Amino acid sequence: INREKAFLAPERIRIVTDYILTHFDKKTYRGDKTYTFSVLKNVSEVASASGRQQIDEIKQKQRVSGFNSIFAVSGVDAAKLYYAEFQRQMAEHPQRRLKIAVIYSYGANEEETDGILDEENTEDTSALDRNSRDFLDAAIRDYNEMFRTNYSADGDKFQNYYKDVSLRM
């Protein structure tokens, strides 16, 4: 069996995405359990601060219901397919809308001959092929619209986007 082909099959991606959207609230305890969490209020400023510039984090205690979630896939092609399917299904069912962001490394996550993965490269996007870069640009535009930010896949703005996503988790 060709596992990669099976994992990227459109029907499988549709079913997995539907399951996640249908069961997300239950699996992440939305509306079920609450806890107090210190929410970072100035995410964009903290994410954009350079190494020399120190920004004080502004946190506010807030009652939160449920948990955030990370959905990891095998590679860039899978990320593109799932992202598109999530967008399609959420457009059809707005009541199941989630806030989704995409982060991927562009070292292709391929194993070296010794079985050790290379370090993730979050410094620049120059190694991306045109299609992957265009996809990432579109996903970052969606993110900017969702959170009223102004990131891109260029240089420092990409590093700041990466930090912003991490801080919001």
Where are these regions (language model features)?
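Conserved C-terminal RecA-like helicase domain
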Residues: E4-M169
